[in-house]
Every structure is written in structure tokens, then in C-alpha cells.
């Protein structure tokens, strides 16, 4: 696999011919909606392991390496019969390696809204370890709202993907509710009821474990939250169920803000089997335009996290969506949420050139809509996902967690499968 950035006048025919593959292979690897139209700057997965370049007049290994964007030492390594790299002849076959041998195994979690389609499930299960089904919303009395997800659980298990039950403190208004969290965390009777309901659901619905996603907890509930997690772990562990906990992305222990203060990385890391760090939403619906998961910010969070949590417990969050902001942005404005496929198609629709922010390692573009309004779109693509896998490797993390898997984006799974051997925890 290589990642190719399209140039003006590029066509799939030209690209396929250059790399010795087929148009249909490129279309499939990228789920391209219209093979006749590409955006300038679009990052495409080219599904090839290596190609054979026939040397012509003026060729050098250096020029060949630049043409194919493959390091010179890799080309030399792939051609042991070349005794003098400075001396190649016309007509000589030069093998250019593109294959990535997965350097390590990894766990991949995918958050799935319960209405995920059967087709999408079949597309994503080869690349997942866990499927965390979102979500059981808890009530103030310890009961939970009903979730109709048995078919998703069954499909996950049928494809050796471990289903996780997700519980949240999402209130009746549809947002994370601090007061609801406070009630649950400070009433032992309510906790006992909730834990019994969780255990019953795990058993009756054939879940593998539970994921706790309590957000916007009051800072004063920090210790109560840890006590609840410990109590939950003690209740489910004897039955073989696992506990994962989703936490906000922090840079330091004492980071202020209701999103962060109740999430004690060290204490949670001691209790949970896995910690899912939600490293996304720097750019968010109601915020100013920016990358959703900037590489530099994500890396800073992970560099702190591994000092508090065992790296082999950490699943680093990656977003699978895009935002479109109307400019100029004013406080109170909201962005339109898109899928990554929609973001790329919109760039093509308006003839926008896709740009690359090297600090954030994220793609974006500007366009003018039919009403004359200027927009900026930030999204994820093969190149940005590839950069994120470097963080997983560099810090030796357990793996990655996708929010969400409901909208299939082929390049995400291509990057995962070319970088990692996906671990299975059930048969």
C-alpha cells in the first residue's frame, strides 16, 4: 500500500498505469463514488506491494526513488542483485517496494450506534477487535433506557468481534448530564441497582464487557467516580467480563475544566482493563474551525497519558467524520457534520483543491457555495490516519478506537489493515 496525492490533470487511468494496478482496485480501496472525478490534493490508497520499473535512458536509483516516493535505501534493499547502485543499465528491471508488513499487532475498537446497517457491519468486522455499542443511558434510579441491539451483538460475535456494552450519563435532553452523574455517583443504593442491571444485561445479551463513558462530571465527583468504577469492576470481574473506560483528552493532571477534572488518568488506569482516550473534537460543532484530531495535540495527550496509564491498556481515539464551517466564524455558529466520503465529494463538487496542514497532519479545503458563502472543511483521510498509526507505534499503545464506525470509510480500514495485525479476543 502507498498513499498518493493527486495532481492537476491526474486521472485514475494515469495513476493505475503508473503504479501497475487497476482502476477498479483503486476505486475499491478508496470507495470512490465517481471514478471520473478526483479532487486535486486528494490522498488515495494505491493497493500495491511492489512494481517493476524498467530502467530507461537517464534513470538513476535516486531519480526512481523520487518518482515513486520510496526511500532510496528501500529500493536498494529490494534489489540485492544491484552491486553498484550508481550503475544501472537501460532495460534493467528495478523492483520498487510498496508493501507494508504489519510491524505489530493491535486492538481496534469501533463505537457503533445501535442502528448500524448490516452491510456496514460486514465491511468493518475484519478490522475490529471490539464493537462498543452506543449506548445504554442510565437513569437517576439506576435503571437504564432500553436499547434494541441484539442483532448487532449477534453479528459481532458471529464475526469474532467482541461486543461491548456502553453506558453513558446522557440525560433526557440528549446531552451528557452532570447532575445525573452526581446522583448516581453519590447514592450507594442507586449504584447497586445500576451495577445489578449492568451485570444482568451483560449476561442476558451475551456481551464481552462494559465500557463506561461518563462525561462532564463535576470535579467534586472525582473520587466518587473512581469508587464507582472500582465497585463495578469488582462486580463483573468474577464473571469474566472486562471493563473499559472512556476519558477526555488531557495534557496534565490538574487540567481545569468540567470535561477533564473528574477523569483521574492514573486511578482509572489502575482499575480498567482498557482506557479509551477520546483524542478528537479539537475542532467541534460549536467551536472555531480547526482540525478535529490534530496530530500535534493528540501526540501531546498521549505523551502525558503513558506516564499515568500502562501503554498496553490505552486505545487512542480516532474520528471518522468531518466538519464544514461557514466563514467568517462567529461565536454561536455551528458546523455541519459530514462523513469523510461526503467531505471529499463536496471538494469535487465545488472544484476545491484539498490542502494539507503539516502540523496537524490533517486535510482541509475552502470553497464558495452556490449562495456565495465561503466555507472551510476539515476531515480525515488515508494520510492523516497513517500519521496517527505512528503515534500508536511510537508509544507502544494497545491500539485505536474509532468514533464511529456507522459510516464506512474504506481508507481508514485500509490503513489499519496495512499497519496492524488486528487482535481477536474471542473465537
Each model region followed by its residue ranges:
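Substrate-binding surface in catalytic domains of secreted glycosidases
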Residues: 140-147, 222-227, 231-349
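Conserved, mostly hydrophobic/aromatic
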Residues: 131, 212, 275, 316, ...
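Glycan-recognition patch characteristic of GH18 chitinases/ENGases
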Residues: 99-192
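Substrate-binding cleft and catalytic face of glycoside hydrolase catalytic domains
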Residues: 94, 151-189, 197-205, 209, ...
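Short, acidic/polar
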Residues: 112-127, 188-203, 257-266, 380-393
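Glycan-binding loop/region signatures in secreted carbohydrate-active enzymes
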Residues: 166-181, 320-388, 418-427
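Primarily a LysM-type cell-wall glycan-binding module
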Residues: 1-20, 42-69, 92
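Active-site groove signature of glycoside hydrolases
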Residues: 132-135, 195-224, 274-288
Amino acid at each position: 500500500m502507498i498513499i498518493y496525492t493527486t495532481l492537476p490533470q491526474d486521472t485514475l487511468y494515469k495513476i493505475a498505469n503508473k503504479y501497475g494496478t487497476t482502476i477498479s482496485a483503486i476505486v475499491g480501496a478508496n470507495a470512490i463514488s465517481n471514478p471520473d472525478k478526483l479532487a486535486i490534493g486528494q490522498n488515495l490508497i494505491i493497493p500495491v506491494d511492489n512494481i517493476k520499473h524498467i530502467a530507461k535512458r537517464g534513470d538513476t536509483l535516486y531519480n526512481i526513488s523520487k518518482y515513486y516516493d520510496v526511500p532510496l535505501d528501500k529500493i536498494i534493499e529490494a534489489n540485492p542483485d544491484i552491486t553498484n547502485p550508481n550503475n544501472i543499465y537501460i532495460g534493467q528491471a528495478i523492483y520498487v517496494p510498496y508493501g507494508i508488513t504489519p510491524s505489530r499487532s493491535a486492538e481496534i475498537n469501533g463505537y457503533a450506534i445501535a442502528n448500524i446497517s448490516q452491510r456496514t457491519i460486514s465491511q468493518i468486522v475484519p478490522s475490529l477487535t471490539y464493537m462498543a455499542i452506543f449506548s445504554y443511558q442510565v437513569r437517576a434510579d439506576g435503571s437504564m433506557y432500553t436499547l434494541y441491539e441484539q442483532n448487532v451483538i449477534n453479528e459481532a460475535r458471529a464475526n469474532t468481534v467482541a461486543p461491548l456494552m456502553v453506558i453513558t450519563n446522557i440525560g433526557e435532553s440528549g446531552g451528557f448530564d452532570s447532575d445525573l452523574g452526581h446522583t448516581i455517583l453519590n447514592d450507594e443504593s442507586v449504584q447497586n441497582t445500576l451495577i445489578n442491571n449492568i451485570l444482568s444485561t451483560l449476561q442476558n445479551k451475551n456481551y464481552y464487557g462494559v465500557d463506561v463513558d461518563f462525561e462532564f462530571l463535576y470535579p467534586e465527583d472525582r473520587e466518587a467516580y473512581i469508587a464507582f468504577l472500582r465497585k463495578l469492576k469488582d462486580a463483573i470481574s468474577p464473571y469474566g467480563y472486562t471493563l473499559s473506560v472512556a476519558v477526555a483528552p488531557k495534557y496534565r493532571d490538574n487540567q481545569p475544566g468540567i470535561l477533564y477534572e473528574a477523569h483521574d488518568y492514573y486511578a482509572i488506569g489502575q482499575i480498567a482493563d482498557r482506557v479509551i482516550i477520546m483524542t478528537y473534537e479539537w475542532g467541534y460543532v460549536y467551536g472555531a474551525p480547526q482540525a478535529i484530531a490534530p496530530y500535534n495535540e493528540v501526540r501531546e495527550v498521549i505523551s502525558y497519558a503513558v506516564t499515568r496509564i500502562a501503554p498496553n491498556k490505552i486505545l487512542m481515539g480516532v474520528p471518522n467524520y468531518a466538519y464544514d464551517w461557514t466563514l467568517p466564524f462567529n461565536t454561536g455558529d455551528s458546523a455541519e457534520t459530514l462523513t469523510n466520503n461526503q467531505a471529499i465529494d463536496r471538494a469535487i463538487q465545488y472544484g476545491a483543491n484539498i490542502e494539507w496542514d503539516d502540523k496537524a497532519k490533517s486535510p482541509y479545503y475552502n470553497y464558495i457555495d452556490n449562495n456565495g458563502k465561503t466555507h472551510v472543511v476539515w476531515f480525515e483521510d488515508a494520510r492523516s490516519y497513517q500519521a496517527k498509526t505512528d503515534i500508536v507505534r511510537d508509544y507502544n499503545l494497545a491500539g485505536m478506537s474509532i468514533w464511529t464506525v456507522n459510516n464506512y470509510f474504506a481508507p481508514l480500514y485500509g490503513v489499519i489493515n496495512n499497519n496492524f495485525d488486528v487482535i481477536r479476543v474471542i473465537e
